[in-house]
From Swiss-Prot:
Keyword terms of this UniProt record: ADP-ribosylation, Cell cycle, Cell division, Metal-binding, Mitosis, Nucleus, Phosphoprotein, Transferase, Ubl conjugation, Ubl conjugation pathway, Zinc, Zinc-finger
Reactions the enzyme catalyzes: S-ubiquitinyl-[E2 ubiquitin-conjugating enzyme]-L-cysteine + [acceptor protein]-L-lysine = [E2 ubiquitin-conjugating enzyme]-L-cysteine + N(6)-ubiquitinyl-[acceptor protein]-L-lysine
Gene that encodes the chain: CHFR
Other facts noted in the record for this chain: CHFR is silenced in many primary cancers because of CpG methylation and deacetylated histones on its promoter region. This however raises the question of whether CHFR silencing is a consequence or a cause of primary cancers.
Pathway: Protein modification; protein ubiquitination
Tissue-level expression: Ubiquitous.
Listed Basic and acidic residues bias regions: 254-264
Post-translational modification: Poly-ADP-ribosylated. In addition to binding non covalently poly(ADP-ribose) via its PBZ-type zinc finger, the protein is also covalently poly-ADP-ribosylated by PARP1. Autoubiquitinated; may regulate its cellular level.
Identification of the protein by name: E3 ubiquitin-protein ligase CHFR
Mutagenesis or variant effect for residue 635 to A: Abolishes poly(ADP-ribose)-binding and poly-ADP-ribosylation by PARP1
Length: 664
């Protein structure tokens, strides 16, 4: 086993550092750091393992000592980051460790009993600290409101205080500004630099403890960005505070030095922070990278934020498209109809086959990151999403602020005991239960996007001008069939079969693609909807429908727009003229069923509009076009040319023509 060196002497057979668990039970042994590289994480193969704590990443971080200089650094390899004192160190970043640093693997702002924190102590003679200072540091961490105004006043008068390093002096003169709302650790750094002779004797005789320690500690899962809200730096953490502003995938420390030179608020003393440890950190970084492969960005992308593990049988939520394990979201949707990540109202739950295939391919290359068989069986048993489905209805709803915003699994806007998710329950505006809910007093406006809330649909602005009597008086039968609007994803009564018998029922589907739309039935409520379903002659295609309308050829499309503008015509006038030509048989469409009265959705209508626009442009007399347009030679490939999207080629050749070469 490799040992760190001290000068030119051979290393003694003893640990070079130790970790003291903050808030640990009496009698729990300290973690002695004996190896050159010490790994911490949830994976059972780590030197310090937390197999039951889902808030700790599989490979959370590693502590490495440089054999030549004795410099100790911590490198973060987690998905959520590691907190040193009050500074968050993110993935692939290294930070030098000093005696008295508090390392948080899990931080709970309002529930400190769930924290997983260790106090680092160097056992070398140059960086040794007394046991009394550690006790004071631990007390200050858990009692952050203690006044420390006089803690630093007597530091200069105490002859027992060792001389401060240049880095420490600069840090105390220029503390890094805080970005949090409160000072969480006001005394941790000050108290950690006050040793006493009695404490030094105690620190030399530390308890024994080895690798492979698996401390207890598991808590409810939280979002991975929870610790980012208190990333204010302690005085002795200024070096890492600047490195934390760099990209996470930075491979060396040289750009950090350049950035510090470029900052206007740093002087020559500030550069001393990285002058000495930079070479050591580079050496350690290269050794660590050669020793073991780092978790790549693919693993971070394929990680579920609820269980903090690789996705298993993942599902995506619509419309926000955030992805979770099916078993994880099954437990969440019992309590809330909001997305765990963005709090957007969930309308539909779908299997994400692409991500599932990516996870399988990733596990083939990294079989060590596979879940255990017991974990897989447990998740399959908890999975209640076996097929694509609507978001289950939640009966009782409350405001998001009523739950704990710190705990992802405990945050809930509903009472889980009253939830009924045995069957997906769809309620539309014309269901009797929806009317009963609408008759009740108005709710708190927080869950306004939830299914069943009157504000979500009934009061939303509609794109429909008026509703017929057949639509207004209709009431859904018990367990009646519903169709989901392809535009706004809101349910409506499925009356397409009834329309064949009663023409008064508004159309609910496109005549070409047969997809359901609610615009003609009661008005689509999606923001930005121009009217997703209408007769072709009444379809609103928007003012930008002429952009690239001619085979995505912007140059030819601009020629047409200029032609219409000089004659005071709009796209609606052109559509009217084209439909008249279509009725006479002058223009033709690829779908012969489409006429001016055919009910089309926006996409199918835009496709037919582009076909008519090409024929309209083709029939413009050459005398009505500029000479620069008519003097261009025809392209061999004509309208089928794949290069016409390039401006230079489009300006040089005419593409409103048929292909003349290689037509077979």
């Amino acid at each position: 086993m490799e040992r760190p060196e001290e000068g030119k002497q051979s290393p003694p057979p003893q640990p070079w550092g130790r970790l003291l668990r903050l808030g640990a039970e009496e009698g729990e042994p300290h973690v002695l750091l004996r190896k050159r590289e010490w790994t911490i994480g949830r994976r059972r193969g780590c030197d310090l393992s937390f197999p039951s704590n889902k808030l700790v990443s599989g490979d959370h971080c590693r502590i490495v000592v440089d054999e030549k200089s004795g410099q100790v650094t911590l490198e973060d390899t987690s998905t959520s980051g590691t907190v040193i004192n009050k500074l968050k160190v993110v993935k692939k970043q290294t930070c030098p460790l000093q005696t008295g640093d508090v390392i948080y693997l899990v931080y709970r702002k309002n529930e400190p009993e769930h924290n997983v924190a260790y106090l680092y102590e160097s056992l070398s003679e140059k960086q040794g600290m007394t046991q009394e200072s550690f006790e004071a540091n631990k007390e200050n961490v858990f009692h952050g409101t203690k006044d420390t105004s006089g803690a630093g006043a007597g530091r200069g008068a105490d002859p027992r205080v060792p001389p401060s390093s240049p880095a420490t002096q600069v840090c105390f003169e220029e503390p890094q500004p805080s970005t949090s709302t409160s000072d969480l650790f006001p005394t941790a750094s000050a108290s950690s630099t006050e040793p006493s002779p009695a404490g030094r004797e105690r620190s030399s005789s530390c308890g024994s403890g080895g690798g492979g320690i698996s401390p207890k500690g598991s808590g409810p899962s939280v979002a991975s960005d929870e610790v980012s809200s208190f990333a204010s730096a302690l005085p002795d953490r200024k070096t890492a505070s600047f490195s934390s502003l760099e990209p996470q995938d930075q491979e060396d420390l040289e750009p950090v030095k350049k950035k510090m030179r470029g900052d206007g608020d740093l002087d020559l003393n500030g550069q001393l922070l990285v002058a000495q440890p930079r070479r050591n950190a580079q050496t350690v970084h290269e050794d660590v990278r050669a020793a073991a492969g780092k978790p790549d960005k693919m693993e971070e992308t394929l990680t579920c934020i609820i269980c903090q593990d690789l996705l298993h049988d993942c599902v995506s939520l619509q419309p926000c498209m955030h992805t979770f394990c099916a078993a994880c979201y099954s437990g969440w949707m019992e309590r809330s109809s909001l997305c765990p990540t963005c709090r957007c109202p969930v309308e539909r739950i779908c299997k994400n086959h692409i991500l599932n295939n990516l996870v399988e391919a990733y596990l083939i290359q990294h079989p060590d990151k596979s879940r255990s068989e017991e974990d897989v069986q447990s998740m399959d048993a908890r999975n209640k999403i076996t097929q694509d489905m609507l978001q289950p209805k939640v009966r009782r709803s409350f405001s998001d602020e009523e739950g704990s915003s710190e705990d992802l699994l405990e945050l809930s806007d509903v009472d889980s005991e009253s939830s009924d998710i045995s069957q997906p329950y769809v309620v539309c505006r014309q269901c009797p239960e929806y009317r009963r809910q609408a008759a009740q007093p108005p709710h708190c406006p927080a869950p306004e996007g939830e299914p069943g809330a009157p504000q979500a649909l009934g009061d939303a602005p509609s794109t429909s001008v008026s509703l017929t009597t057949a639509v207004q008086d209709y009431v859904c039968p018990l367990q009646g069939s519903h169709a989901l609007c392809t535009c706004c994803f809101q349910p409506m009564p499925d009356r397409r079969a009834e329309r064949e018998q009663d023409p008064r029922v508004a159309p609910q589907q496109c005549a070409v693609c047969l997809q359901p739309f609610c615009h003609l039935y009661w008005g689509c409520t999606r923001t930005g909807c121009y009217g997703c379903l209408a007769p072709f002659c009444e379809l609103n295609l928007g003012d930008k429908c002429l952009d690239g309308v001619l085979n995505n050829n912007s140059y030819e499309s601009d020629i047409l727009k200029n032609y219409l503008a000089t004659r005071g015509l709009t796209w609606k006038n052109m559509l009217t003229e084209s439909l008249v030509a279509l009725q006479r048989g002058v223009f033709l469409l690829s779908d012969y069923r489409v006429t001016g009265d055919t009910v089309l959705c926006y996409c199918c209508g835009l496709r037919s509009f582009r076909e008519l626009t090409y024929q309209y442009r083709q029939n413009i007399p050459a005398s009505e076009l500029p000479v620069a347009v008519t003097s261009r030679p025809d392209c061999y490939w004509g309208r089928n040319c794949r290069t016409q999207v390039k401006a230079h080629h489009a300006m040089k050749f005419n593409h409103i023509c048929e292909q003349t070469r290689f037509k077979n």
